[in-house]
A protein has these predicted regions:
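Catalytic cores of nucleic-acid endonucleases
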Residues: 227, 251-295
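Conserved beta3 VAIK motif of the Hanks protein kinase fold
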Residues: 247
Length: 305
């Protein structure tokens, strides 16, 4: 209690930099400015990206494909990365998800329906990278015996985003050049949570690759949108220091239909911003000015955007 008085006192009497961390159950980073009269800089601490994950493993001759498979399954939380076996990783992930994430959100926001919050959280994490509607979630949960209104679902989604479990990503109309306030996507901030709650039957790897690419862009400092075109969508519009790039992310280009889907998404986009397709294919097939990158090369920053 009253920690801000102590911090302000130190700052007034000592020439020091003060770093503050804490649980989301007590204080969100966005509220620090209020407590400390605005004299703060918020630094978002993310799970390891893939390059940091490999550095943490400190293997002299790393097999990047094996490391990526582990990263895609268990994510980049340091405590999980340091665990010796799969069973321990699973236990740690479950403990973080249940004891930290859920309890922090419930305590911080005084949630009076923790079970419904858990169902919303499970849904949003298990459907990372898919378009989400609060109305659809409310309808699904209500039909399964968990009656909840759409406004309550949207409030729970806000709490989940505030707790840094998922990011909400807006759509951007490329032709109209404006952000849209509907059909947002949510991306889970650590792949380990996706592993715990995955519920897809097909195309699972495509969604995992998309989530990895999103988190990599965020770790590099990009502002990210989902692109809306007349034909459909572009996975990501990413902006950093005034530079804009387009990115399509997929598992493998296994046939001509898949190639057309990923490269064809850029059809009729009139601007000249760089356009990329990122997949796990070892051999790349850039075409029509669209650059194809291998995912591991992209994550290890061997290629530039």
């Amino acid at each position: 209690n009253n920690f801000e008085l102590v911090v302000n006192s130190f700052r007034a009497t000592h020439n020091v930099s003060i770093f503050i961390t804490g649980s989301n159950s007590k204080l969100l980073s966005g509220e620090l400015a209020t407590h400390l009269s605005g004299r703060t800089v918020s630094l978002r601490v993310l799970p390891f990206n893939f390059m940091e994950f490999c550095q943490y493993k400190d293997i002299s001759a790393p097999d990047y494909e094996t490391l990526l498979a582990e990263y895609m399954t268990y994510g980049g939380l340091p405590l999980v990365c340091g665990a010796d076996n799969k069973e321990t990783k699973e236990v740690i992930l479950n403990n973080i998800y249940d004891a930290v994430v859920l309890k922090d959100i419930v305590m911080r926001n005084k949630i009076n329906s923790p079970l419904v919050l858990e169902k919303v959280l499970d849904y949003i994490v298990g459907n990372s990278s898919l378009t989400v509607s609060g109305n659809a979630i409310a309808s699904t949960l209500s039909s399964n015996g968990h009656k909840v209104s759409a406004p309550v679902v949207y409030d729970y989604l806000r709490c989940i985003v505030d707790a840094c479990v998922c990011d909400k990503v807006s759509r951007y109309d490329i032709r109209g050049k404006k952000a849209l306030a509907f059909e947002e996507k949510y991306y889970v901030c650590d792949l380990g949570f996706l592993h715990l709650k995955k519920n897809r039957i097909k195309d699972e790897y495509n969604y995992i690759i998309e989530t990895i690419c999103y988190n990599e862009l965020i770790s590099r400092g990009y502002k990210v949108y989902v692109g809306k075109t007349w034909k459909g969508e572009i996975d990501f519009i990413a902006e950093l220091n005034g530079k804009i790039v387009y990115i399509q992310a997929a598992y493998l280009l296994t046939d001509e239909k898949t190639i057309e889907r990923e490269f064809g998404a850029y059809e009729k986009i009139a601007d000249n911003y760089p356009k990329y397709v990122i997949t796990l294919d070892k051999h790349t097939i850039s075409r029509n000015g669209i650059i194809h990158y291998n995912l591991i090369d992209f994550l290890l920053r061997k290629v530039d955007l």
